[in-house]
Regions:
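Short beta-strand element of Class I
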Residues: 27
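Short, polar loop motifs at secondary-structure junctions
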Residues: 30-36
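Structural motif
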Residues: 2, 66-67, 113
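SDR active-site strand-loop-helix element
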Residues: 6, 30, 71-72, 114-120
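NAD(P)H-binding glycine-rich loop region in Rossmannoid oxidoreductase-like domains
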Residues: 36, 43-96
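Active-site Tyr-X1-5-Lys
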Residues: 139-148
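N-terminal Rossmann NAD(P)H-binding glycine-rich loop of SDR-like oxidoreductase domains
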Residues: 3-23
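Conserved Rossmann-fold NAD(P)-dependent oxidoreductase catalytic core, especially the SDR/UDP-sugar
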Residues: 86-88, 98-140
Length: 148
C-alpha cells in the first residue's frame, strides 16, 4: 500500500511511519522541513509541503495514494499556551486539513481513505468519569481545538 503521512516527523507520526514500514507499506511523509534527498529505507520518501490551506506540487503524492493520514499540527507541548500560541495550534491544524482535503478532492485518483487525528483532549478532563465515543465533547481549550 502507498500511504501519505502528514505530520510524519512528529511524536505519533514517526512511530506510525516505522510501524507501517515494518508491515511492508510504502510511506511518503509530507514535511515542512527540507526533505532529505536520500533515505536508507526504500519504503520511505519525503515530499516538502507548506500546509497553508492551498494545494501545491506536493499534491502529486496524494494522487494515487491508497490512504492519506493527517497528524499534522504545531506541537501541543512546544510552549506555553499564550493567546498567540493557541492561535498557532488552531491554525496549523485547520490549514493542514484544508490543504489535504483540497488535494484529495482535486486528485484524479483519490485515496480510498482519509484518516485525520484529533486528540483525547476532545473529551476534556472529566476526572473519574467513564468516557465512550458517544460522550459529549469537553469545553476546555483542547476540546475546542479538536472540534475545530
Amino acid at each position: 500500500m502507498k500511504i501519505v503521512l502528514a505530520g510524519g516527523s512528529g511524536f505519533l507520526g514517526s512511530a506510525l511511519s516505522r510501524a507501517l514500514r515494518r508491515d511492508g507499506q510504502d510511506v511518503t511523509v509530507l514535511t515542512r522541513s527540507p526533505a532529505p534527498t536520500t533515505t536508507s529505507d526504500p519504503r520511505l520518501s519525503f515530499v516538502p509541503w507548506t500546509p497553508d490551506g492551498t494545494v501545491g506540487t506536493w499534491a502529486s503524492a496524494v494522487n494515487g495514494a491508497d490512504i492519506v493520514v493527517n497528524l499534522a499540527g504545531e506541537s501541543i507541548a512546544a510552549s506555553r499556551w499564550s493567546a498567540a500560541q493557541k492561535d498557532k495550534l488552531r491554525e496549523s491544524r485547520i490549514l493542514a486539513t484544508r490543504s489535504l482535503t483540497s488535494a484529495i478532492r482535486q486528485a484524479a485518483r483519490p485515496p480510498a481513505a482519509f484518516v485525520s487525528g484529533s486528540a483525547v483532549g476532545y473529551y476534556g478532563d472529566r476526572g473519574d468519569e467513564t468516557l465512550t465515543e458517544t460522550s459529549p465533547p469537553g469545553t476546555d481549550f483542547l476540546a475546542e481545538l479538536a472540534k475545530d
